[in-house]
Amino acid sequence: MVELSKKVTGKLDKTTPGIQIWRIENMEMVPVPTKSYGNFYEGDCYVLLSTRKTGSGFSYNIHYWLGKNSSQDEQGAAAIYTTQMDEYLGSVAVQHREVQGHESETFRAYFKQGLIYKQGGVASGMKHVETNTYNVQRLLHVKGKKNVVAAEVEMSWKSFNLGDVFLLDLGQLIIQWNGPESNRAERLRAMTLAKDIRDRERAGRAKVGVVEGENEAASPELMQALTHVLGEKKNIKAATPDEQVHQALNSALKLYHVSDASGNLVIQEVAIRPLTQDMLQHEDCYILDQAGLKIFVWKGKNANKEEKQQAMSRALGFIKAKNYLASTSVETENDGSESAVFRQLFQKWTVPNQTSGLGKTHTVGKVAKVEQVKFDATTMHVKPEVAAQQKMVDDGSGEAEVWRVENQELVPVEKRWLGHFYGGDCYLVLYTYYVGPKVNRIIYIWQGRHASTDELAASAYQAVFLDQKYNNEPVQVRVTMGKEPAHLMAIFKGKMVVYENGSSRAGGTEPASSTRLFHVHGTNEYNTKAFEVPVRAASLNSNDVFVLKTPSSCYLWYGKGCSGDEREMGKMVADIISKTEKPVVAEGQEPPEFWVALGGKTSYANSKRLQEENPSVPPRLFECSNKTGRFLATEIVDFTQDDLDENDVYLLDTWDQIFFWIGKGANESEKEAAAETAQEYLRSHPGSRDLDTPIIVVKQGFEPPTFTGWFMAWDPLCWSDRKSYDELKAELGDNASIGQLVSGLTSKNEVFTATTTLVPTKLETFPLDVLVNTAAEDLPRGVDPSRKENHLSDEDFKAVFGMTRSAFANLPLWKQQNLKKEKGLF
């Protein structure tokens, strides 16, 4: 029997928020390199551990993923390892069985850029590699609107259909072909995946080109490459509809008591919807069947060990006995550590330290200490780099160097500005830490929401340059404003401040007399930051701490629902924002000048639910649709404001009220049916909801604070600043450089490699003085005015630019153009 080895438990990190992934290789668990996260071989099985910080402790989700071509032995090993890992963690984890192509939304949400299925597996010698691999030739079929899944398919036009998006990956060139019937959201998600492959696997050096299926004639070079690789285009198949599940099926619930008396599986129905928590006896194990769409296994804390260990295998036996699909999702719950998804299936559910219903047990006069999670070097030196999305490799006490991008170059940030990040800037943070004698580095590329396109491009280029300086060894982490990972916050020890606009460069900061409001979020020095929000009362939230800086004072405002930990961190970060004395203002006891500074007192997010530190039913966001004539709701896990697409409608369920958010581009029938759709949601909810629950219809741009309060750092200008699909497509680069790559491809019979020439043929050379500062009309016949540099001899080229042609070709386009202008060859 397989057992969780000390090699695995020794490296397993129980206190770092993020994910860790292992592949089953020869029946052993082998860590997957961080840069390969999101890539899964169809012939293999994987185990994924997700760790989250919850209050004073941690919650865990363990998923075992089964590739469609994996062996029964590997599948069994993955299941056993999952059970053993749960026991190692104290039997508090939620276990999930994931089957390729049928993964849960929770699993897919770990990979925001997309999930890629790769052909082969460990048995055929397939390895998870790091970056800079150009010897690639594959066709990816991309599906999904929110959480994208891409599968490797046969390199043929037969694989295409009119309704989906496909990526032809040729190493240095990635071609995105958009089916004529695919929508903008699908095209945008596929483009994000293509960019992620370019940046994560090719260090930003590959080119991405897009072909619109309804207008292929507009991209002749890319179509030339497609036909060169795939052959002459054949008739494309019709669109295949995405699998959709009727909400009514989700609401069909049956609870079973399962035992294997006399060696036979005995299934006894206990109850149907509505279900209540007291139906679950602590001495037993149960199966909750959600109409065959998903199976939940609940293990009572006092059930015998054998029953607990057999829970997953019993669920699989139940699926077989019911003739359900083998791909049916299975989730295993431990008594007292149930997932929110499981709890919301019951009409009534209470957790320890909470009163029944929506009330909250509050402790008066108790001040919580700032919790310190131990990531000291003594503990960490025996652990390799933790496979976690948030890169929490240590306690942040290593050496950090910070630069700001200025005029496309790096300028060191003064010590007094460390931890201050301005929305008009881009920054590079080089973090150095040691594991024993070995030096390790992480490069964080922080990109402000209002930084220029040139600065965004320069930050990526400078990161590659810095990476090369250290032999391509550092881990690169791109951080968009508002999505700062825990380790980046830990580097600044809870003193990270993010400003909406402005710059820390000379003359770029706003006057010290300006009034600013900061939303402080975090409970310890590893997860705290202050985020600037609009200076108005509506920005406040009863659940958090805020810092209001005025020309004459600086207020520290404590909402009624904030914890002692949050108050302590609020004090710490406030000292960074202002050196003046900070009067503490408790919610409800604000002096008149406080409201004057905010432009007057108005309503803000202050509902009783917001004051609960640990609500038993967390808010849930669903993307809604009635396009098929029936109500469909797709849950968005770990939602943020960025998940709200202005062309769609969404339902935010906070249990005691339902919000229906309507984007400006939503269709008329969805707008008209808003209240009715929300009522249908309540009627079909498996938890037998109160049909009198208030339903609030919210229009984009007119959101009340009771809605925005459920989103971290709500930005009213979010959609006006958001780039369109066409704008993002235009940023991919010019067609000339792609044309050169296509010429290089079609003139050869081989796949692109890192050494593929970017110039298709040898052009006629001319003396330097004939080309420099010469107008197009005065150039000799045969000279391409846009490519003067390619008419230089190799010696002249190196003398002028101080580098070889290949080094020049690896520079970003803006850098190439600047050099050409400087040398008179533009």
Curated annotation (Swiss-Prot):
Residues 1-734 are annotated as: Core. It comes from the Eukaryota. Changing G144A: Reduces the actin-severing activity. Does not affect actin-capping activity. A 1,2-diacyl-sn-glycero-3-phospho-(1D-myo-inositol-4,5-bisphosphate) binds at residues 112-119, 138-146. The keyword rRNA-binding does not apply. It holds the Pfam family VHP. SUPFAM superfamilies: Actin depolymerizing proteins, C-terminal, gelsolin-like domain of Sec23/24, VHP, Villin headpiece domain. Epithelial cell-specific Ca(2+)-regulated actin-modifying protein that modulates the reorganization of microvillar actin filaments. Plays a role in the actin nucleation, actin filament bundle assembly, actin filament capping and severing. Binds phosphatidylinositol 4,5-bisphosphate (PIP2) and lysophosphatidic acid (LPA); binds LPA with higher affinity than PIP2. Binding to LPA increases its phosphorylation by SRC and inhibits all actin-modifying activities. Binding to PIP2 inhibits actin-capping and -severing activities but enhances actin-bundling activity. Specifically expressed in epithelial cells. Component of brush border microvilli. One of its GO terms (molecular function) is phosphatidylinositol-4,5-bisphosphate binding. Monomer. Homodimer. Associates with F-actin; the association with F-actin is inhibited by tropomyosin. The keyword Cytoplasm applies. One of its GO terms (biological process) is cytoplasmic actin-based contraction involved in cell motility. Its main location: cytoplasm. Changing H141A: Does not reduce the actin-severing activity. Does not affect actin-capping activity. Keywords: Actin capping, Actin-binding, Calcium, Cell projection, Cytoplasm, Cytoskeleton, Repeat. InterPro entries: ADF-H/Gelsolin-like_dom_sf, Gelsolin-like_dom, Gelsolin-like_dom_sf, Villin/Gelsolin, Villin_headpiece, Villin_headpiece_dom_sf. Belongs to the villin/gelsolin family. Residues 760-826 form the HP domain. Consists of a large core fragment in the N-terminal portion and a small headpiece (HP) in the C-terminal portion. The core fragment is necessary for both actin-nucleating and -severing activities, whereas the HP binds F-actin strongly in both the presence and absence of calcium and is necessary in actin-bundling activity. The Gelsolin-like 1 repeat is necessary for the actin-capping activity. The entire core fragment is necessary for the actin-severing activity. Gene3D superfamilies: Severin, Villin headpiece domain. Residues 820-823 are annotated as: Absolutely required for activity. CDD domains: gelsolin_S1_like (cd11290), gelsolin_S2_like (cd11289), gelsolin_S3_like (cd11292), gelsolin_S4_like (cd11293), gelsolin_S5_like (cd11288), gelsolin_S6_like (cd11291). This is Villin-1. Phosphorylated on tyrosine residues. The unphosphorylated form increases the initial rate of actin-nucleating activity, whereas the tyrosine-phosphorylated form inhibits actin-nucleating activity, enhances actin-bundling activity and enhances actin-severing activity by reducing high Ca(2+) requirements. The tyrosine-phosphorylated form does not regulate actin-capping activity.
